[in-house]
């Protein structure tokens, strides 16, 4: 059971890290080159779609990590769970509110948020990618 939980945790967390890295390294830089209206529409659409899917992915990854930590009692697994907790707090307290402002603007019209707001999200997202990578390493080493 422990091995199955660890394999699933590595797969789910690894793909999560890959998607988040892809958004940070490829998608957002491509979107950055668009004119303002297209830029905000792309950011809002991406935020809406990923904002719907990612909570389930994060919860699944965290639950699997907790399972690995409970079953294995290894320091690496416990560290992975703690780092994932930090990721989730960062996400819920800073990244989600910024994302919600971008998504809300696209539906309401009016003056667009500044690109600096999106750049702040991008910087915080890179921090999240680094933390997720550390969590992935922890669960992989458990």
Please tell me what each predicted stretch does:
Residues 88-94:
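Mid-bilayer segments of alpha-helical transmembrane spans in multi-pass integral membrane proteins
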Residues 2-9, 13-60, 98, 103-119:
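Interfacial loop at the N-terminal end of multi-pass membrane proteins
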Residues 139-142:
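Juxtamembrane boundary at the C-terminal end of a transmembrane helix
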Residues 2-14, 70-85:
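Interfacial segments of alpha-helical transmembrane regions
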Residues 95, 99-100, 125:
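Asparagine-centered polar/low-complexity signal
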Residues 48, 55, 78-81, 119-122, ...:
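Internal alpha-helical transmembrane segments of multi-pass membrane proteins, especially GPCRs
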Residues 54-69, 128-137:
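Core segments of transmembrane alpha-helices
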């Amino acid at each position: 059971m422990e091995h199955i939980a660890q394999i699933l945790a590595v797969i789910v967390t690894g793909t999560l890290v890959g998607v988040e890295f892809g958004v940070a390294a490829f998608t957002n830089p491509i979107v950055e080159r668009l004119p303002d209206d297209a830029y905000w529409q792309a950011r809002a659409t991406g935020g809406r779609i990923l904002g719907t899917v990612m909570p389930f992915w994060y919860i699944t990854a965290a639950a699997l990590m907790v399972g690995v930590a409970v079953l294995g009692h290894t320091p690496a697994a416990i560290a992975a769970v703690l780092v994932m907790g930090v990721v989730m707090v960062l996400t819920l307290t800073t990244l989600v509110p910024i994302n919600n402002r971008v998504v809300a603007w696209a539906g309401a019209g009016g003056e667009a948020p500044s690109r600096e707001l999106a750049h702040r999200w991008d910087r915080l997202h890179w921090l999240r990618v680094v933390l997720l990578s550390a969590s992935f390493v922890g669960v992989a080493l458990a």
